[in-house]
């Protein structure tokens, strides 16, 4: 359980097509996140699943 996101680790996450932070949501905790941002990105919610570095999104480029 991540203190910044009240859903279990590995929980259900969804991200809209282009993956812009404002449109990405953790479906189970309803907090904004960006699943394709690299670990440590301050602009994105902590505790959310992230894709590989080759799939960076514009919000954290």
From Swiss-Prot:
It comes from the Eukaryota. InterPro entries: Metalthion_dom_sf, Metalthion_dom_sf_vert, Metalthion_vert, TNFR/NGFR_Cys_rich_reg. The keyword Coiled coil does not apply. A divalent metal cation 7 binds at residues 57, 59-60. The modification N-acetylmethionine is found at residue 1. Residues 1-29 are annotated as: Beta. A divalent metal cation 3 binds at residues 15, 19, 24, 29. A divalent metal cation 1 binds at residues 5, 7, 21, 24. PANTHER family: METALLOTHIONEIN, METALLOTHIONEIN 1H-LIKE PROTEIN 1. This is Metallothionein 1H-like protein 1. The gene is MT1HL1.
């Amino acid at each position: 359980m991540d203190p910044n996101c009240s859903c279990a680790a590995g929980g259900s996450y969804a991200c809209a097509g282009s993956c812009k932070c404002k449109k990405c949501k953790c479906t189970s905790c309803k907090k904004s996140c960006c699943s394709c941002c690299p670990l440590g990105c301050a602009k994105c919610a902590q505790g959310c699943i992230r894709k590989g570095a080759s799939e960076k999104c514009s919000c954290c480029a």
